[in-house]
Amino acid sequence: MPSKMTNFGKFAIVDSGVKIDVDLSRFNKQYQKAQYGLDGDVMTSMIPFMPMQSGIFVDVTRAASASVQGTGKVYAAYGPAGQFLYKGKVMVSSVTGSTWARLGEKKVLVSQYSGQTKAKEDLSYNKTAHPEAQAYWFDAAKTRDINKWVKNVKKNAGGGKRG
């Protein structure tokens, strides 16, 4: 469902004694539809590049994005594992250096850990479910699908006839 975002309204231009009333509010629905579609297209485009084992991470991220769809926000990575999965970096307990941390224990990047750890710096993604899985998957999706996104936005916003 599109958000209640207002892009344009009514305004007046006065120049040299001439007053022009302009009402662009009729475009709001088109732009809301375009934004809603773009947000959905971005999320859908990212999925093949996201790491997936059980599917929970992808599903949680998709649900979080769906909850804000139409606002111009898309979650590329949601939940506690999101940051390190998106950046492709291993995080360890700041206390023990283990990849497992106790409840409430802060996790840091391997490069920020002051002690010794056997953890590797970079994540290695399982590519069984998603062969194109990689870090920074929004960028990969954007590189592949930006032209499709623009075409759909133009179409939904009412300007798609000219390309």
Annotate each predicted stretch with a short phrase.
Residues 22-23, 129:
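General secondary-structure edge motif
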Residues 13-16, 20:
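Small-xxx-small helix-packing motif
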Residues 2-13, 33, 47, 54-163:
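Charged, low-complexity interaction tracts
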Residues 23-54:
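Charged, well-structured alpha/beta interaction segments
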